């Protein structure tokens, strides 16, 4: 009747919009468009505030950057540079199909390789940094957050790459490294592989 939901286990509740925003990791506008499409309702072209448009544009760019990074890591895994990473996965009995299905990859030993690749694709430093893929400091300059690691893309329930987990090859520390929280990645709200469970 009220068209609301409530979970007695975790206390989450709301309406259809908040459900999609929580469960699907949609923005309000994405939830609205999804529901309108599903109901066959045509939405008028809306006027966004400048801030809302900038935020939506930034989210879209961060998703693009993460997708490009995941593709790059996968290609690296399949190249001669990624032999150590591929061997790691093969020792754990992961098939080529599993590696492909989960988009597993490898970040090689060069500490600015992904950065140079993303720059060649036209992405700006500030956006690559906002995606959590590089670090910038006065002493070392710009360097990749992940290098010499097997890579596990973290996807939202819509299979969009929102972050990464990496396991180092060798004895370096930290052994495991995850993306920092970003505009599109909230560690507490995402579970690795959930997109595959749907």
Question: Can you annotate each of these PLM segments?
Answer:
Residues 18, 29-30, 83, 87, ...:
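Short, acidic loop-beta-alpha module within alpha/beta folds
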Residues 1, 155-158, 172:
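Short acidic-glycine loop/turn motifs at beta-strand connectors
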Residues 119-147, 196-198:
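Short, basic/aromatic recognition patches
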Residues 4, 161, 174:
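A residue-level signal for beta-strand positions that form part of recognition/binding surfaces
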Residues 1-126, 130, 149:
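Non-catalytic accessory segments of DNA primases and related replication-initiation nucleases
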Residues 107, 143-144, 186:
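Residue-level marker of regulatory loop/turn positions in helix-turn-helix DNA-binding domains and
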């Amino acid at each position: 009747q009220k068209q609301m939901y409530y979970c007695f286990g975790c206390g989450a509740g709301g309406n259809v919009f908040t459900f999609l925003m929580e469960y699907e990791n949609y923005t309000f506008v994405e939830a609205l468009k999804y529901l309108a499409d599903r109901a066959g309702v045509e939405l008028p072209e809306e006027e966004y505030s400048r801030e809302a448009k900038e935020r939506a544009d930034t989210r879209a760019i961060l998703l693009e950057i993460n997708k490009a990074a995941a593709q790059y890591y996968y290609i690296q895994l399949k190249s001669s540079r990624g032999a150590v990473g591929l061997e790691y996965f093969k020792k754990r009995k992961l098939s080529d199909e599993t590696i492909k299905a989960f988009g597993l990859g490898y970040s090689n030993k060069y500490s600015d390789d992904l950065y140079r690749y993303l720059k060649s694709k036209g992405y700006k430093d500030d956006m690559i940094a906002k995606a959590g893929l590089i670090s910038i400091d006065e002493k070392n300059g710009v360097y990749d957050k992940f290098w010499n690691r097997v890579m596990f893309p973290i996807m939202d329930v819509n299979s969009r790459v929102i972050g990464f987990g990496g396991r180092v090859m060798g004895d370096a520390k930290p052994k495991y490294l995850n993306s920092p929280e970003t505009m599109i990645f909230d560690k507490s709200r995402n579970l690795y592989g959930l997109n595959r469970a749907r």
